UniProtKB/Swiss-Prot annotation:
Keyword Aminoacyl-tRNA synthetase included in the entry's annotation: no
GO terms assigned for molecular function: transaldolase activity
Keyword tags: Pentose shunt, Schiff base, Transferase
The organism of origin for this protein: Cyberlindnera jadinii (Torula yeast)
UniProt protein name: Transaldolase-1
EC number assigned by the record: 2.2.1.2
């Protein structure tokens, strides 16, 4: 979670 993986996680 945080920058660009927020949508995957």
């Amino acid at each position: 979670h945080g920058i660009h993986c927020b949508t995957l996680l």
